[in-house]
Structure formats: structure tokens, C-alpha cells
Amino acid sequence: MWPPCGTLRTLALARSRGARACSGDGGVSYTQGQSPEPRTREYFYYVDHQGQLFLDDSKMKNFITCFKDPQFLVTFFSRLRPNRSGRYEAAFPFLSPCGRERNFLRCEDRPVVFTHLLTADHGPPRLSYCGGGEALAVPFEPARLLPLAANGRLYHPAPERAGGVGLVRSALAFELSACFEYGPGAPALPSHVRWQGRRLALTMDLAPLLLAARSP
């Protein structure tokens, strides 16, 4: 069983304002903590482009109102998977199950947002995501960074169960952009990245996966 579930349930019900249509999701309505069947509860969340997690119906979404408990964040995002529940699949494309609870997630861009580059004296660097520190991290693959001209954002491989592609938070993307090299004629996108003394060609192999994820 998921230890933070009880606390989370209390918070969700306390903050809920009753049935509420989510903007931009086709007019779907829900109530936080609703029970569509016996002993089952449903909650609804939103992750922004900074990797901050909120109750979806929170009117104010900022650092003060986002979830910060590391244990909860690790459990929530480590269980994240595509929503194949038959409920709210279009509006909330990801689901983090917790026993008899269904925790639905929609996102501003991607469900995984990389927030920190973790380096150590021994071992390769890792990218941490969504406030989970070392417990939510993947190996850093600089050659597979994907800069997208359409929105000016940077992407990196993410766990397959969470869509395979994650967004790099803007502050971290700015730091990493200093490592990019551009070809002759100052093209819009970089062609190489310099990392730890090596010059690596950007593979751009994430582009088809990202475009497929964005297709209706």
C-alpha cells in the first residue's frame, strides 16, 4: 500500500471545489476523491513545464501550492504509466495507480520534466526529474538531447512507461545550451554538443517519438 495515500486523500478533498470542468480537455467534469465504484477513489493532477505537480483543479498553481513531499513524488512518478483505464483517457493521458486509487495526470507538455543534473565523483551523470532527486533519475545522454525549434524547448529520453521523452526545465536547458555547437551559416538548431571533452553529434532520434506523442 502507498503510505502517503491517506494524507493525499485528505488534502485533495480539502482543496476540492466540487465537480469542475477542466479547461482545454473537452469539457470533462470530475470531483476530486470521487468514487465511481465501491472502495475506489479517483484524483486528478497536473504537471507544469517546470515539473511541479498540482491538484488539477487548483486555481492557483505556483511553488506554494505544488506538491513537495519527496516520498509522495517518487511514488507518484515511479508508478506513472499511460492511461488505459477506459476513463478520462483523452483528457488525462497518464495514470499513477495506488491500490484502489486512480491518480489521473495531464501535463502542460510532458509528464516527465527534468529539473537537475546530478554529478558524482564516481559514476556517470544523471538527470533527475519532477522533484524526486536521485530516486527519480535517468542516465544523462547528451548526444540524444533534442532541441525543438517549434517551441524553443529541449527534450531528453525518459522512462518508456512515461512516454519515452521528457522535457528539460528551462533553467537547466539554458545551462546545457552552452555546450551546443552550430553548423556554418548559424542554423536554427545545433548539430553537436560538447560534453566532458568530447564532441558528440546530436542524434535527433527522439523527434519521431515526440511528434507521435503530440499527434491527436
Swiss-Prot record:
Read off the Pfam families from this record: DUF4505
**Using the chain's own numbering, where are the disulfide bonds?**
none
Record-level GO cellular component terms: mitochondrion
- Classify the source by domain of life: Eukaryota
Family indicated by similarity: Belongs to the UPF0598 family.
Protein's name in the database: UPF0598 protein C8orf82
Whose protein is this, by species?
A: Homo sapiens (Human)
